[in-house]
């Protein structure tokens, strides 16, 4: 029997797509930038106006030759179907002449169209023409996800602030015309699940007050370049349900944590610059001592090291700590046995050193309690430039000979010249394996088309 011709047996990509129902096509088109959605109008008569019914707008000002073209397109899209809900709206906004009343009016129209997902990324560099948000955004009853960059919030009337469905909020370089607006905004979100705040120079953020019983994830990062002129805002956190908190490159006078879940994972990179610095450090360490998983930066540990030395204070017990990721600098590396001594139930340990001293300067006589009872996994990372073979051996010996329940010691490539010697060290734990990670290979994808995009979205849509 003759084989069917390729032309008859194999549907083209456009034929296969066109066989889908309109509702499914609209959901697929809502996942791509509007510019690409418009291009589908050329495929066939059926597709000519399909993009006009997509419940999403994804715009980039730089893709339009003239600013007036973008404005005309925006207005015509909304006017074509006055009842169309705009569930997702994204605008990369970069114009030379910003007209605030017209911009606010357009965003206001979108907010009132049943909006669920809003992203505004402003790249306007005109100080006098701040990109402001409409007051209606404060009371958008349908909004679920909010992402804003370099925009301004005007002070609202308190009774207008209500975002009952908002679950994720990402604010970067956002200015507030009032020091209490951010706190009011956060507390108005009854179901807020994830909050990200990234501060920039001159954003006039005021204090960061995060009070939310529903919040599970909180990320705070500083992009400020000159701490001498403008420190990061003070922070106050009261989030009993918080499961993850990340503080990156932060420096403030005060960081108060009233309440945090004992199951929380915390990533800390913060230092303090306050008159009563010792009290601030003590309260902060005590507040995070209840968490289950902790990642702590070298400069934060250096601050703690200086505090302990100057005040002859003891680091509080981290009795609940199960997993620790810690980075040590040259000036504070020797405190790591002492710090581990405060973690009696530690199970997994990841240590990173920016250097190692000479063997004669190493004193690892203190054996923490967790070495005897709970520590099962250790990973050591030393820069490849560190050449002190004897120092690396001392570090490895410290764990191999003292950890009675250790199951695995992972060493990075810097230990390549001593790995065989380390494996011959008599082990306190007979079942301990000593290994080095294999190099990672990047996955490279080739080519792209609309078909794999659609195939990826269909299962997700059908599951909804």
Curated annotation (Swiss-Prot):
Aminoacyl-tRNA synthetase among keywords: no
UniProt keyword Magnesium, yes or no: no
Classification via InterPro entries: F-box-like_dom_sf, F-box_AtFBL13-like, F-box_dom, FBD, FBL13/AtMIF1-like, LRR_dom_sf, LRR_FXL15/At3g58940/PEG3-like
Domain F-box: 15-62
Pfam family for this entry, one: FBD
CDD domains: F-box_AtFBL13-like
Source organism of this protein record: Arabidopsis thaliana
Family matches, as Gene3D superfamilies: 1.20.1280.50, Ribonuclease Inhibitor (3.80.10.10)
Protein name: F-box/FBD/LRR-repeat protein At1g80470
Top-level taxon of origin: Eukaryota
Keywords, in A-Z order: Leucine-rich repeat, Repeat
All residue ranges annotated as the FBD domain in the record: 359-413
Start-end of each LRR repeat: 96-122, 123-150, 152-178, 197-222, 223-249, 273-298
């Amino acid at each position: 029997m003759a084989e069917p011709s390729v032309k008859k047996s194999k549907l083209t990509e456009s034929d296969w797509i066109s066989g889908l129902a309109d509702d499914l096509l609209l959901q697929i088109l809502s996942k791509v930038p509007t510019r690409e959605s418009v291009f589908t109008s050329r495929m066939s008569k059926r597709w000519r106006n399909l993009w006009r019914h997509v419940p999403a707008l994804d715009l980039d000002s730089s893709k339009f030759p003239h600013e007036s073209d973008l404005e005309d397109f925006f207005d015509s899209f909304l006017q074509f179907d006055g009842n169309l809900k705009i569930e997702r709206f994204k605008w990369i906004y970069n114009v030379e002449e910003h007209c605030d009343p017209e911009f606010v009016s357009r965003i206001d129209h979108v907010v009132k169209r049943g909006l669920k997902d809003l992203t505004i990324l402003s790249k306007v560099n005109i100080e006098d023409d701040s990109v402001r948000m409409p007051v209606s955004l404060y009371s958008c009853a349908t909004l679920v996800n909010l992402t804003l960059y370099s925009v301004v919030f005007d002070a609202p009337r308190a009774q207008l602030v209500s975002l009952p469905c908002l679950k994720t909020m990402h604010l970067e370089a956002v200015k507030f015309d009032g020091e209490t607006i951010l706190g009011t905004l956060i507390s108005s979100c009854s179901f807020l699940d994830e909050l990200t705040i990234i501060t920039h120079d001159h954003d006039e953020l005021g204090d960061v007050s995060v009070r939310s019983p529903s919040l599970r994830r909180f990320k705070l990062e500083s992009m400020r370049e000159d701490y001498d002129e403008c420190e990061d805002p003070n922070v106050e956190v009261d989030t009993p349900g918080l499961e993850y908190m990340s503080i990156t490159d932060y420096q403030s006078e005060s960081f108060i944590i009233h309440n945090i879940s004992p199951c929380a994972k915390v990533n800390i990179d913060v230092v303090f610059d306050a008159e009563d610095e010792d009290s601030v450090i003590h309260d902060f360490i005590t507040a995070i001592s209840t968490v289950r998983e902790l990642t702590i930066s070298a400069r934060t540990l250096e601050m703690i090291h200086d505090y302990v030395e100057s005040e002859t204070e003891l680091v509080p017990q981290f009795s609940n700590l199960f997993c620790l990721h810690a980075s040590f600098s040259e000036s504070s590396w020797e405190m790591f046995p002492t710090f581990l001594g405060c973690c009696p139930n530690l199970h997994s340990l990841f240590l990173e050193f920016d250097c190692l001293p000479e063997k004669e300067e190493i004193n690892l006589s203190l054996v923490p309690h967790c070495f005897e009872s709970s520590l099962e996994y250790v990973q050591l990372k030393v820069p490849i430039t560190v050449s002190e073979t004897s120092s690396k051996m001392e570090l490895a010996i410290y764990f191999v000979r003292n950890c009675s329940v250790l199951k695995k010691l992972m060493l990075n490539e810097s230990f390549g010249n001593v790995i065989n010697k380390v494996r011959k060290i008599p082990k306190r734990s007979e079942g301990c394996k000593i290994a080095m990670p294999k190099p990672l290979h990047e996955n490279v994808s080739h080519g792209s088309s609309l078909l794999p995009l659609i195939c990826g979205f269909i299962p997700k849509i059908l599951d909804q």
